[in-house]
Design a protein with these regions (language model features):
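Cofactor-pocket helix-loop regions in the catalytic cores of large enzyme subunits
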Residues: 1-158, 184-235
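Loop-to-helix "switch" segment enriched in basic
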Residues: 178-183
Length: 235
């Protein structure tokens, strides 16, 4: 889904960086991993709780970062410590020792980064999974500085960059609504050209407009709309 990011990760692995992959499937990236945690689909929360448990139990959290930059850590510890790691391992179908080693590797590295795609977010426990990923980064101090962080990857190639730069029908660069007169004035003064005063068509609306002969052309860059969008026959 993200070949450029994947290539960058592979390059770092070839330079000796350790790679942890949580994936039910043995992908090309998983084959390069030092720790491939082949969890059952839908058990991300269980495995992440295991990792948090091992980090806390081995006192590998960043005490200074936790004290200065987080809240509610005492309650967090109580919640993590009450987890039954053996039961979590059984539910996820993973090797407890492998998860422990991966957790220690993540916590003890000078810098640790995390990347996840729609396989994490577009599932029943997606929100909880992302929260636990953020918890991992925070308790180890792997956020807010160069070479660390949580990196969510969006669904299509460069959709994040396109949105950041204002390639959206309803927002300009910086995510300001184009229908707002204050934002229109800002954009017009910034770019020296008159800015649109109303939102354009979103993708599903474009299809309807094309059918109604209101849309004369569509410039498609880097996306297969027939495969990507719902109802291929309609598209």
């Amino acid at each position: 889904a993200h070949p450029v990011t994947g290539a960058k990760i592979k390059q770092q692995v070839m330079k000796g960086k350790k790679l942890i992959v949580l994936d039910p499937v043995t992908t090309e990236l998983a084959r390069l991993a030092d720790y491939h945690i082949k969890l059952r689909p839908g058990t991300n929360v269980a495995v992440l709780n295991m990792m948090l448990h091992f980090i806390i139990k081995n006192k590998l959290h960043n005490a200074d970062f936790v004290r200065d930059r987080t809240e509610g850590f005492d309650n967090f510890i109580k919640e993590i410590e009450r987890q039954d790691v053996d039961e979590l391992a059984r539910v996820a179908g993973v090797d407890k020792q492998l998860v422990k080693e991966a957790a220690i590797a993540y916590a003890t590295a000078k810098n640790s980064m995390e990347f996840h795609g729609l396989g994490v977010t577009e599932q029943e426990q997606g929100s909880k999974t992302v929260m636990l990923i953020a918890d991992l980064a925070m308790i180890t101090g792997n956020i807010g500085r160069k070479g660390v962080g949580v990196n969510p990857l969006r669904g299509q190639n460069n959709v994040q960059g396109a949105a950041d730069m204002g390639c959206q029908p309803h927002q300009g660069a910086g995510y300001f609504e184009v229908a707002d007169e204050k934002n229109q004035k800002f954009y017009t003064e910034k770019y020296g050209v008159t800015h649109p005063t109303k939102a354009g068509l979103k993708i599903p609306q474009m299809f309807e407009a094309a059918i109604n002969k209101e849309l004369k052309g569509l410039w498609i860059i880097g996306e297969d709309i027939v495969q990507t969008d719902p109802n291929s026959a309609h598209v």
